[in-house]
Curated annotation (Swiss-Prot):
This is Cilia- and flagella-associated protein 300. It is found in: Cytoplasm; Cytoplasm, Cytoskeleton, Cilium axoneme. Keywords: Cell projection, Cytoplasm, Cytoskeleton. One of its GO terms (cellular component) is motile cilium. Belongs to the CFAP300 family. It comes from Xenopus tropicalis (Western clawed frog). Cilium- and flagellum-specific protein that plays a role in axonemal structure organization and motility. May play a role in outer and inner dynein arm assembly. Its main location: cytoplasm. The keyword Cytoplasm applies. Coiled coil: none annotated.
Length: 267
């Protein structure tokens, strides 16, 4: 959505940062040590903002446009500087946004049971190794990374296309691939546990009063923003491991931002 297609709907949303909000996965020592090992520490963050009007998912373009136009967002939204590698705020005038709604309906980790049943992970939890292959910035040295990265992999279809579009799967994939100098795990446990921790940290659920079933009420968007020079958020350098998700809680009227910029993590 660009300035030329600005909607009056967007004007009604305003945002303010929730500065005292903490996220467990960023403060938990064990999780931080894993993020450091995966070369993501110091390049991944989560932030919280509140908004002041009722939000419906069909308003996603207007909502995200308003988010990136809000001066309180621009002065607080963190990015990793391409020049220094340090945290700075976005601060630039956004001319266009791209918004993709992400499927988010998984209530358990059963999505990953196929890793065991299809021989990608042994019963012990150890990830099966393979001969090294190389794809872009990634070394593929095990069956897990083959399934995640290679479309022509023999076992690619253990995850359906709809599985691969789920926020839970995307989180898992991001953690498995890590940053520029990622040290891969030999076992699947740390990836699954960290995925679950972040997922629960970011999403809100509610019990349906009629069916008594738990359902996710948060809406997830993958976003990017552009200034007069091109893409400026999450970075001016596109990479599949550089990402930003907005997670919207319609009851609390909170927006959580999950951000990562591919590179060498902090030690």
């Amino acid at each position: 959505m660009s300035a030329g297609s600005f909607s009056t709907e967007a004007a009604k949303f305003s945002f303010s940062p929730i500065l005292n909000k903490t996220f467990g996965f960023l403060t938990n020592r064990d999780t931080r040590e894993l993020l450091m090992k995966w070369s993501m520490n110091g390049r991944i963050t989560a932030q919280a903002f509140r908004y002041d009007e009722c939000f419906q998912p069909y308003q996603k373009n207007d909502f995200v446009w308003a988010f990136f136009q809000d001066p309180d967002v621009l002065s607080h939204l963190k990015i990793v500087s391409e020049n220094s590698g340090q945290w700075v705020t976005l601060g630039t005038k956004v001319k266009k946004v791209d918004v993709q709604e992400i499927l988010c309906s998984q209530l358990s980790m059963s999505l990953f049971d196929c890793l065991y049943s299809e021989g990608i992970v042994r019963e012990s939890g150890h990830i099966c190794k393979c001969l090294d292959e190389y794809l872009d910035d990634f070394t593929i040295s095990d069956e897990l990374r083959k399934v995640l990265l290679l479309d022509d992999c023999e076992k690619h279809d253990v995850f359906s296309q709809s599985d691969r579009e789920q926020f839970l799967f995307l989180l898992f994939k991001h953690l498995c691939l890590g940053g520029a100098i990622c040290q891969f795990e030999d076992t699947i446990g740390p990836y699954l546990e960290t995925t679950k921790s972040i997922y629960k940290d970011l999403l809100s659920v509610q019990k349906d009063p009629e069916t008594k079933q738990i359902r996710i009420i948060s809406t997830v968007f993958k976003v990017s923003a552009y200034d007069e020079n091109g893409m400026c958020y999450p970075s001016g350098r596109p990479h599949q491991q550089t990402f930003a998700y907005l997670i919207v809680d319609p009851l609390k009227r909170h927006v959580y931002v999950l951000y990562h910029c591919f590179g060498g993590g902090a030690f």
